[in-house]
A protein has these predicted regions:
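FAD-binding core of flavoproteins
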Residues: 24-124, 128
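Alpha-helical interface subdomain recognition
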Residues: 1-25, 108-214
């Protein structure tokens, strides 16, 4: 956690690479949120939240969290509600200040790098699966329909990769448009994830629902 992504360009790139690796290995820990912590507060991590029923995937973690809205209102997380699915819990907040506008862009961009790592891994596993699995005496990868689906997924992944690099550069340069770039990246990441995960799930067939290795 000694990386300094807010004031050091090398630290910013290293933080993005670390988040991508965490996503690739499906690490069940909010690495991006820890790395995005504000430099002017004594806190362990930053959570970008919505205005109504704020929640985050930090259930069971006892770290000191700071939450920030898109308009820069920062709050201290004083408690958590019951843990829901995927480690998500509602947050109890105490407003701290309204000085968090500069914190938001990085808090949005780094989690997108985590999601990008997940897409990297999903496509890698799917390519390996269709190259091994056979139907009608041929590997799945030899069928044109499968190739088209994988191409669509890779186009989404590679497009997100380029946009993530641009948004990271925008944050590092402290451009006035950095927040807009971060929001565009977030929207693109969610759209790409829907397509990539759907394709990968479909091409894994029943393996997507059960363990066929035993």
């Amino acid at each position: 956690w000694e990386l300094d992504p807010r004031t050091d360009t090398d630290g910013l790139e290293a933080a993005a690479a670390l988040c991508r690796s965490a996503g690739y290995w499906a690490l069940p820990y909010p690495v991006a949120e820890r790395l995005a912590k504000p430099v002017d507060l004594d806190t362990d991590g930053l959570l970008v939240i919505g205005g109504r029923r704020p929640a985050a995937a930090v259930a069971g973690l006892s770290a000191r969290w700071t939450a920030v809205t898109l308009d820069g209102v920062r709050s201290e997380v004083t408690g958590q509600g019951p843990a829901g699915t995927e480690f998500v819990t509602e947050l109890q907040l105490a407003q701290r200040d309204t000085d968090g506008a500069a914190d938001v862009a990085l808090g949005l961009v780094l989690p997108c790098w985590t999601l990008l790592g997940m897409l990297d891994r999903a496509i890698e596993l799917t390519v390996a699966h269709v190259s091994l699995r056979k139907q009608f005496g041929q590997t799945l990868s030899s069928f044109q329909g499968v190739q088209f689906q994988l191409t669509d997924a890779e186009v989404e992944r590679s497009g997100l990769d380029m946009l993530a690099k641009y948004a990271l550069w925008s944050v590092g340069e402290r451009r006035p448009e950095a927040l807009h770039d971060a929001l565009a990246l977030l929207a693109a990441a969610l759209e790409a994830a829907e397509i990539v995960f759907r394709v990968c799930h479909q091409l894994h067939g029943a393996v997507g629902f059960c363990d066929e290795t035993t």
